Amino acid sequence: MKKSDFHYELPEELIAQAPLAERAASRLLVVPPAPAAFGDRQVRDLPELLQPGDLLIFNDTRVIPARLFGQKASGGRVEILIERLLGEREARVQIGASKSPKAGSVIALDAGGQAEVLGRDGEFYLLRFQIPTPLEHWLLEAGRLPLPPYIRREPGVEDRERYQTVFAREVGAVAAPTAGLHFDEPLLARLRERGVEFGHVTLHVGAGTFQPVRVDKLDQHVMHKEWLNVGATLVEQVRRTRARGGRVIAVGTTVVRSLESAWRKTEAAPEGELQPFAGETQIFILPGYRIRSVDAMVTNFHLPESTLMMMVCAFAGRERIFAAYHHAIAQRYRFFSYGDAMLLWGGESGVGNGES
């Protein structure tokens, strides 16, 4: 399988550069299993599309202002993107500079303080910060929000709120789980009234999510690592949902990645079952992989040739996904992080397109 198998052409003007005024006003392309027709709805219509007893699972990670700027002793400019916090004063980071900094070198930070390069960690660097407060708190004032590179503007005050989900609580991501950006408190209240239950996982989206696939043969691709936590409470919620005939709906690819990473074969469940898990995942989901943990997913539109595009093709089928993307482009949907969303149903869900 090749990277080029997941390419599509997208008019640049369809890349959303800013969020809509209302989160739930985003459009929602409902994609039932073939041959049912697609449905053009809005995210605020989700209560009509789900059933009492269904379980929506969100990623509760919170984005940190992870971008910093500084200067080497030589005078060369440096851009730092924090990939993961490693305690109160250390972090794993990406560094952009004309020449790679050496271990022991010190970067003077524009926001004040210094960062010492401890060494390499694969494609990343390890930094120790000399700052007055723990890094997590210091970044709230000193860091800049790391908007994706396809958003061609500087982050503004509005992004501090809008590039964060309303249920974000576990600090550690450098990019938002963007499917969750569409949910606001009024929509969550209407879903509760409908009888839909909520669960949460944590997956700290890392800087690797911005990196393109650099090889054409996908069996040569090395997937980036991310830390996640699927707790016992969520596992029990899923078990109860299945027992009563409800459906499990992931809000975002990060939730699918979390649940599939926590899927384990046991003697009692030879096909596998969800189990509590906390740790790193490097799972790479592409066509040929069977996603077992969810019946549906809410997800944004993904970049051509990205691992996220490959994941949704694994879930709904490549032909079906490409047909949906062509429909979305023709209907002028907005793409990527601040864009519109899809509701993808798996092949055995038995649902329609939500059109009356």
Swiss-Prot record:
GO CC terms for this protein? cytoplasm
Q: Which PANTHER family match?
A: S-ADENOSYLMETHIONINE:TRNA RIBOSYLTRANSFERASE-ISOMERASE
Query: The organism's lineage?
Result: Bacteria, Pseudomonadati, Pseudomonadota, Gammaproteobacteria, Lysobacterales
Subunit info? Monomer.
Protein's cellular compartments:
Cytoplasm
Q: Name one GO molecular function term.
A: S-adenosylmethionine:tRNA ribosyltransferase-isomerase activity
Q: Which reaction does it catalyse?
A: 7-aminomethyl-7-carbaguanosine(34) in tRNA + S-adenosyl-L-methionine = epoxyqueuosine(34) in tRNA + adenine + L-methionine + 2 H(+)
Q: What is this protein called?
A: S-adenosylmethionine:tRNA ribosyltransferase-isomerase
Give the EC class as a word: transferase
Predominant location category: cytoplasm
Gene behind this chain?
queA
Please state which protein family the record places this protein in.
Belongs to the QueA family.
Q: Tell me the route in metabolism or biology where this protein functions.
A: tRNA modification; tRNA-queuosine biosynthesis
InterPro entries under this entry? QueA, QueA_dom1, QueA_dom2, QueA_sf
